[in-house]
UniProtKB/Swiss-Prot annotation:
Top-level taxonomy: Bacteria, Pseudomonadati, Pseudomonadota, Gammaproteobacteria, Oceanospirillales
UniProt EC number: 3.4.21.107
Catalytic activity, reaction form: Acts on substrates that are at least partially unfolded. The cleavage site P1 residue is normally between a pair of hydrophobic residues, such as Val-|-Val
UniProt protein name: Probable periplasmic serine endoprotease DegP-like
Molecular function terms from GO: serine-type endopeptidase activity
Length: 469
């Protein structure tokens, strides 16, 4: 009897587990139909370019048969060649690989600017293996988008979706050519929306965990309705490979750029002229703000619309042109959608009060110099500081501050300060000398958090600084 009871229990448990597995499987999306419908409008893009190349020096590492593609990968994601890659220059041919997709029946193709940047010839290969030499209609390096045109008719096209409707947790799918493997399909979820990256602050990126690798760039990101909601652009990595964090340009941003490229061959956008950062809870507290939102100005560029309007470093922009700023990444996009010579109101928080400042926007310069930088380290409070060397100040456009020459631990270390940071402001007061820095720091009570402005590796930012006992 006991034996029979055990067998019955095993059957019941097995049935329950099987039912649970089937229910779970049924709840997962089936991408088959989506891929079949969307793939014909996805293209493979390859380029030819005559370049001056470098070979590995003594002790340099060899990267194998696909070294050129890997070199491009390192260059795009890290801004430099792999370690050891220096040698006498040689003339040669370089090819790059990427993805794209067809947005009109008469042959307009959208991809990333970095996929075709500097190319002499651009090849577009369709799903049915037809191949065309594409004409470059225009590019927008600030959003990393490029519009191509191939001479063909009745082409399959993608359906464009509304990226504003995307929410974290929704399924998304990518089709592209990672490492040259055509029409590779990967899927994942939206991790976040509105991500602002330091080098691309005109794009509120879609962050996903979809596997993206070299060759995926420029390819479409689909929602479950088969609509393109993003253009896969870049990844975050410490290993050189995919680590679960990838970024896509929202379709809304892309189509705005496409419209201008089609009509003018270039993109014009308004310019405010500030460097900004998010306001976290500690910064909000240190500024006396009752909520952690807005865009904190860390630097006002010389002769910019912001400077002319009277905006200052340390101002927190709460609203711009009537639109609330929840986080700093929203401001560049709002400004970028506006036209030069538009006059707008900015609601800012300054010295514990809200005020409205009128700003007249201007056309963005082709190459505004927005970067300052830093190198060494500082004094007291767990650090040794020194005067900023004249050559450093001139080179990086630093007009005041002290440089951290050494972090000793304690307060400096706990506040995240690093050797090479340049401290330009503390508790709302400009730092002009080592003595002045020590005096201002001495007047700050222990345990109280105050705003500190630092320049780190060329990027200015505010941090909440708290003196530890």
């Amino acid at each position: 009897m006991n034996r029979l009871l055990k067998q019955v229990c095993m059957v019941v448990v097995s049935s329950f587990m099987m039912a649970s597995m089937l229910t779970h499987a049924a709840s997962l999306p089936d991408f088959t139909e989506l891929v079949e419908k969307a793939s014909p409008a996805v293209v493979n893009i390859s380029t030819e370019q005559t370049v001056t190349t470098k070979t590995a020096n003594e002790g340099g590492q060899q990267l194998g048969p696909n070294s050129e593609e890997l070199n491009e990968f390192f260059k795009h994601f890290f801004g430099q060649q792999p370690f050891g890659q220096q040698a006498p220059p040689q003339q040669g041919q370089r090819s790059s690989l990427g993805s794209g997709f067809i947005i009109s029946h008469d042959g307009y193709v959208l991809t990333n600017n970095h996929v075709i940047d500097g190319a002499d010839v651009i090849h577009v290969r369709l799903n049915d293996r037809r191949e065309y030499v594409a004409k470059l209609v225009g590019t927008d390096p600030r959003t990393d988008l490029a519009l191509l045109k191939i001479e063909a008719d009745d082409l399959p096209i993608v359906k464009m979706g509304d990226s504003d409707k995307l929410k974290p947790g929704q399924w998304v799918l990518a089709i592209g050519s990672p490492f040259g493997f055509d029409y590779t399909v990967t899927a994942g979820i939206v991790s976040a929306t509105g991500r602002s990256l330091p080098s691309d602050n005109y794009v509120p990126f879609i962050q996903t965990d979809v596997a993206i690798n070299p060759g995926n760039s420029g390819g479409p990101l689909f929602n479950l309705d088969g609509e393109v909601v993003g253009i896969n652009s870049q990844i975050y990595t410490r290993s050189g490979g995919f680590m679960g964090v990838s970024f896509a340009i929202p379709s809304k941003v892309a189509m705005s750029v496409v419209d201008q490229l089609k009509s003018d061959g270039k993109v014009s956008r308004a310019w405010l002229g500030v460097l900004i950062q998010d306001v976290n809870n500690e910064l909000a507290e240190s500024f006396g703000l009752d909520r952690s939102n807005g865009a904190l100005i860390s630097r006002v560029l010389p002769d910019s619309p912001a400077e002319k309007a009277g905006l200052k470093s340390g101002d927190i922009i709460l609203e711009f042109n009537g639109q609330s700023i929840a986080h700093s990444g929203e401001l560049p996009y709002i400004v970028g959608q506006m036209k030069a010579d538009e006059k707008v109101d900015a609601k800012v928080y300054r010295d514990g009060k809200e005020q409205t400042i009128s700003v007249t926007l201007e056309a963005r310069p082709n190459d505004p110099k927005v970067v300052a930088q830093s190198q060494q380290d500082q004094n007291r409070l767990g650090m040794i500081v020194g005067e900023v060397p004249a050559d450093m100040a001139k080179k990086f456009e630093i007009d005041n501050g002290v440089v951290i020459e050494q972090v000793l631990g304690g307060t400096a270390a706990r506040n995240g300060l690093q050797q090479g940071d340049v401290i330009t402001m503390l508790n709302g007061k400009r730092i002009t000398s080592v003595a002045e820095f020590a005096k201002i720091a001495k007047d700050i009570p222990s345990g109280r958090s105050v705003p500190m402005r630092v320049i780190r590796q060329g990027y200015p930012m505010f941090i909440p600084f708290k003196i530890m006992d």
